[in-house]
């Protein structure tokens, strides 16, 4: 047999053995997790911003499952709070966040002050900042969650958090206040026409 064929057979045998070992280990050492934690974690926005006081969304999901408040996630907003309340079977808190945090904000980079250090890009958990080394950076407003993690690392203080401009697309339309009236139609039935 040629040396290439022997090498291929040896590598295939090693791959098979290691695959079996990993498969056995994954079954043997499987960690059972609480399904409610997984459901809560799926609802959270996964920005890992830390505004809730926990190092990420998974630890916050575990805290909610253990009875912590459901309204500590500013990037998730009111929609996330309502989904969490529905899942946990609790009432939606009347004031989700304090007044200052309830106004959605996004990062804004003053490009005339930006030196292109990329520290804000590295800090952004959702990759909402674009730019390169020694080039100007800008924020993709639709992607920014307002987590405020990019402000502190900036050496020139060229990043500020500004309120989101209200447009017809992001306006909170309250459709429940529109009166709905059922109009009865008094059309004669076919049997009365005969």
From Swiss-Prot:
Primary localization class, coarse: membrane
**Location of the protein in the cell:** Cell inner membrane
Q: What is its EC number?
A: 7.-.-.-
Q: Which residues bind [4Fe-4S] cluster 2?
A: 114, 117, 120, 154
Names of required cofactors = [4Fe-4S] cluster
List, for all copies, the residue spans of the domain called 4Fe-4S.
Answer: 32-90
Region annotation (Hydrophobic) maps to 1-26
Query: Where's the 4Fe-4S ferredoxin-type domain?
Result: 105-134, 135-164
Amino acids binding [4Fe-4S] cluster 1: 49, 52, 57, 73
Q: Give the co-factor note.
A: Binds 3 [4Fe-4S] clusters.
On the tree of life, the source organism's domain of life is Bacteria
Which Gene3D superfamilies does the record associate with it? 3.30.70.20, Electron transport complex subunit B, putative Fe-S cluster
User: A single GO molecular function, which one?
Assistant: metal ion binding
Q: What class of enzyme is it?
A: translocase
| GO BP terms, alphabetized | electron transport chain
> InterPro entries from the xrefs?
4Fe-4S_dom, 4Fe4S_Fe-S-bd, 4Fe4S_Fe_S_CS, Elect_transpt_cplx_RnfB/RsxB, RnfB/RsxB_Proteobac, RnfB_subfamily
* Gene Ontology cellular-component terms listed: plasma membrane
Q: Where does [4Fe-4S] cluster 3 bind?
A: 124, 144, 147, 150
PROSITE patterns reported in the protein's UniProt record: 4FE4S (PS51656), 4FE4S_FER_1 (PS00198), 4FE4S_FER_2 (PS51379)
Q: Which UniProt keywords apply?
A: 4Fe-4S, Cell inner membrane, Cell membrane, Electron transport, Iron, Iron-sulfur, Membrane, Metal-binding, Repeat, Translocase, Transport
Subunit info? The complex is composed of six subunits: RnfA, RnfB, RnfC, RnfD, RnfE and RnfG.
Q: What does this protein do?
A: Part of a membrane-bound complex that couples electron transfer with translocation of ions across the membrane.
| Family, as annotated | Belongs to the 4Fe4S bacterial-type ferredoxin family. RnfB subfamily.
Instruction: Supply the name of the protein.
Output: Ion-translocating oxidoreductase complex subunit B
- What is the organism field in this record? Aliivibrio fischeri (strain ATCC 700601 / ES114) (Vibrio fischeri)
């Amino acid at each position: 047999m040629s040396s290439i064929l022997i090498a291929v057979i040896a590598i295939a045998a090693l791959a098979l053995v290691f695959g079996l070992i990993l498969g056995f280990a994954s079954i043997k050492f499987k960690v059972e997790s609480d399904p409610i934690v997984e459901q809560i974690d799926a609802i959270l926005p996964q920005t890992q911003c830390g505004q809730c006081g926990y190092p990420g969304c998974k630890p916050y999901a575990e805290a909610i499952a253990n009875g912590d408040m459901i309204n500590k996630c500013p990037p998730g907003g009111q929609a996330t709070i309502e989904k969490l309340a529905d899942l946990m079977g609790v009432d939606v808190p009347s004031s989700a966040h304090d007044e200052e945090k309830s106004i959605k904000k996004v990062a804004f980079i003053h490009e005339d002050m930006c030196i292109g250090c990329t520290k804000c890009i590295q800090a952004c958990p959702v990759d909402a900042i674009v730019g390169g080394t020694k080039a100007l950076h800008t924020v993709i407003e639709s992607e920014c969650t307002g987590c405020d993690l990019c402000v502190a690392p900036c050496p020139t203080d060229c990043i500020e958090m500004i309120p989101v401009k209200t447009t017809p697309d992001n306006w909170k339309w309250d459709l429940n206040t529109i009166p709905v009236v059922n109009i009865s139609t008094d059309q004669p039935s076919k049997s009365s026409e005969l």
